[in-house]
Regions:
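Hydrophobic alpha-helical segments of integral membrane proteins
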Residues: 1-10
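Transmembrane helix-loop junctions in multipass membrane proteins, especially transporters and channels
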Residues: 9-17
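Soluble cytosolic regulatory domains appended to membrane proteins
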Residues: 16-180
């Protein structure tokens, strides 16, 4: 528990209140390894977690070229009948208006299916849109992690300096990065 609190303080964004450095936490981990407190996988996870501030969104994102997106004026019936297998594979799908590279939010596939079960076939995807967290491609993954946890969101869009989507980062991407 103590180590968990220390790591959280080290990775946290308020640098002015740090009373322990990353190096000190790393030294504690090394001692824990020597004394048999940590297993190899645990050590790797802790070390990866400590490096989250050095990893940026562009390094872990899923590139826009392979992200399934949906236009906000698409009907739920068209969504359901779409032959794009990716629309049926993911739980959260980014939504755009006219230009696919400018994401407005996302839709939960479960929300679409719920509305379809109530025979709302003519309803538009835009009626179900949820806000999406947006980060620049050079944002440290530690900041993304903190905000995703705070907002209880599992998806974020990564943009360039012009607001164009470069890709997405999901909670799963961050966790995989933390676990090494």
């Amino acid at each position: 528990v103590l180590l968990s609190e220390l790591i959280t303080r080290v990775v946290g964004s308020d640098k002015a209140q740090l009373s322990i450095s990353r190096e000190e936490v790393q030294a504690m981990v090394d001692v824990g390894v020597e004394e048999g407190v940590f297993k190899a996988k645990e050590t790797k996870a802790i070390r990866s977690f400590l490096k989250l501030g050095e990893v940026h969104a562009e390094q872990i994102m899923t590139p826009a070229t392979v992200v399934a997106t949906v236009r906000e004026d698409m009907t739920l019936k068209d969504f359901y009948e779409s032959e794009d297998e990716h629309l049926h594979s993911y739980s959260r799908i980014p939504v755009y208006d006219e230009a696919e590279e400018y994401i407005k939010g996302y839709v939960l596939r479960a929300d679409v299916l719920e509305e379809l079960s109530e025979d709302h076939f003519a309803q538009r995807i835009g009626d179900l849109i949820r806000p999406i967290l947006t980060f620049r491609d050079d944002e440290p993954v530690s900041n993304i992690w903190e905000l995703m946890l705070e907002k209880k969101e599992h998806i974020s869009v990564i943009i360039d300096e012009y607001g164009t989507m470069r890709g997405i980062v999901t909670m799963e991407d961050v966790i995989e990065t933390m676990l090494g």
